[in-house]
Amino acid sequence: MAEITASLVKELRERTGAGMMDCKKALTEANGDIELAIENMRKSGAIKAAKKAGNVAADGVIKTKIDGNVAFILEVNCQTDFVAKDAGFQAFADKVLDAAVAGKITDVEVLKAQFEEERVALVAKIGENINIRRVASLEGDVLGSYQHGARIGVLVAAKGADEELVKQLAMHVAASKPEFVKPEDVSVDVVEKEYQVQLDIAMQSGKPKEIAEKMVEGRMKKFTGEVSLTGQPFVMEPSKSVGQLLKEHNADVTGFIRFEVGEGIEKVETDFAAEVAAMSKQS
């Protein structure tokens, strides 16, 4: 067995753009023969995947699944909505979700490692960067999920509620984007930041500080209601709040998770001509 030196790994990295561990693995399998390693990497799609790794993957799908008293939600990204609808991409996302559920995996790095070879092969086949972005789970007495197309997914956990109510609550979360369950759950740093913003606005209107502070106190109560699930008007019956709805059913929400495809990812905008030019350079 030939010695796989750091300089050999470095050279392969420079020539292929692949990751260090991928290069070391390829060299080991090729017994230190760098040309054979490159040939094998080309066949496996590793080089193509490495070249695509820098491309922003901000499209994709959200998948949800309930397994007993635990529900899982997963986001897998690609670069375009066209690929997001591809059967192979969808099957890959389903397989990753099934593995997360079966193994109770909530560490995305574990999933990434488990499916790296399949991801690389799919990148080579489809021609876009693919990323297993995030996974989460939620436990509860009664669980519900809702998916708005493939782009928004919601899990809701409740007690004292039936499945229909939990489904409606999940639909509400999808539409209204609450950040917390109850107004009292709003974190101190969020409250303080909003308080300062509102105080500055009130002071700029020329109000004395004492009056401005009283105005802001009223606004803050409204703010914590707006960002919390129970404080929001129920989307299916806006005359009542979600909190009032839950009280009528003697139910309580213990948690929720909302994923939306690409949220927080800065997508690079390119015009059609630039996109065609970029594609011609790659071919």
From Swiss-Prot:
Source species, domain of life: Bacteria
Location in the cell: Cytoplasm
UniProt GO molecular function: translation elongation factor activity
Membrane is among the record's keywords: no
Keywords associated with the record: Cytoplasm, Elongation factor, Protein biosynthesis
Family in the record: Belongs to the EF-Ts family.
Name of the molecule in the record: Elongation factor Ts
Organism name: Salmonella paratyphi A (strain AKU_12601)
Recorded name of the encoding gene: tsf
